[in-house]
Amino acid sequence: LAENDQVGALVFDEVDTGAPVEQMEFEEVDYWDELTKIMDWTNTHVTSTMFLCWGAQASLYHFYGLKKRMLPEKKFGLFWHKVNNRKIPLVRGFDDEFLAPHSRHTEVPIDDIRACKDVTILAESDEAGFYLGMAEEGRKIFVMGHPEYDRMTLDGEYHRDKDKGLPIEIPKNYYKNDDPNTKPVLLWRSHANNLYTNWLNYYVYQVTPYNLDGTPDFSGK
């Protein structure tokens, strides 16, 4: 792996994903200073960054001062979402309503995000709140759920916490008849594929400025 000083001169497409530290204050996380430097670095070295779950919370806090808050109980399972603006390419091909996984103890209140003029909310849930948004014409993408989860991820989290004796509810809309002994029903794959395809097509490949040698050129950004 390249060292930090070597990576700093390179350019990438980037996904900042979640971490099991969401119940800590951001500044209490051991690597918070390093993470903020990486987030700032993306402004000049990454065409578009997708921030997932805690990564979305961290970026909304770092860039816009939006604070997270604890939920009374874990938001866990599949939740229905609606699309807010179909003219935006990121949601092209989305169903009017779609399911996506969530697994978190905290949230950024959607009213706080709505009040932030820099962030456009593209999809939300009556039950799970903010799900998908963007800023800077798509240079920053925020996903509060986990579309990347495979069929068994929520199942693994449920049985892990149950085996530890932790308070955990059966993930919503996930098992047939809410029976955790059955194989989970995979209901979000097409949405996830659509989201990542749109992101890479419309916000990375089509807009990354390239030099003649094939390397991205950010000199004009």
Where does each model-flagged region fall?
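Amide-donor transfer/coupling interface in amidating biosynthetic enzymes
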Residues: A2-Q6, F76-K221
